[in-house]
């Protein structure tokens, strides 16, 4: 397969979606996020934090103070797909994220 075919195949595949957490091990504070593509979200957050690019300034400040070793990055839940490439999962992800925010008394990423 050439690059264009691989790109088209990727676009025709439903990616794993769900909820993740970034936890400050030192103070126990939890940040919850959702993603339509879970495969790269942890690495994306780590990259942003390491390069002081994260949009959550409170999380960024904590990361700058204690470093990566002071945090855990975990997948909390996956959203079951409907096998429809055109379906918009935004509402379902928001509901699932809100449930985890309430359950863990956490902040949003």
Go through each PLM region and give its residues:
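Structure-specific nucleic-acid interaction/processing domains
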Residues: 1-32, 36-109
């Amino acid at each position: 397969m050439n690059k264009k075919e691989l790109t088209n195949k990727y676009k025709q595949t439903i990616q794993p979606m769900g909820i993740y957490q970034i936890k400050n091990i030192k103070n126990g504070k939890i940040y919850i996020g959702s993603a339509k593509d879970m495969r790269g979200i942890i690495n994306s957050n780590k990259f942003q934090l390491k390069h002081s690019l994260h949009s959550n300034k409170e999380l960024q400040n904590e990361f700058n103070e204690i470093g990566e070793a002071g945090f855990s990055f975990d997948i909390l839940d996956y959203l079951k797909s409907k096998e429809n490439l055109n379906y918009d999962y935004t509402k379902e992800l928001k509901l699932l994220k809100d449930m985890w925010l309430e359950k863990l008394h956490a902040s949003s990423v």
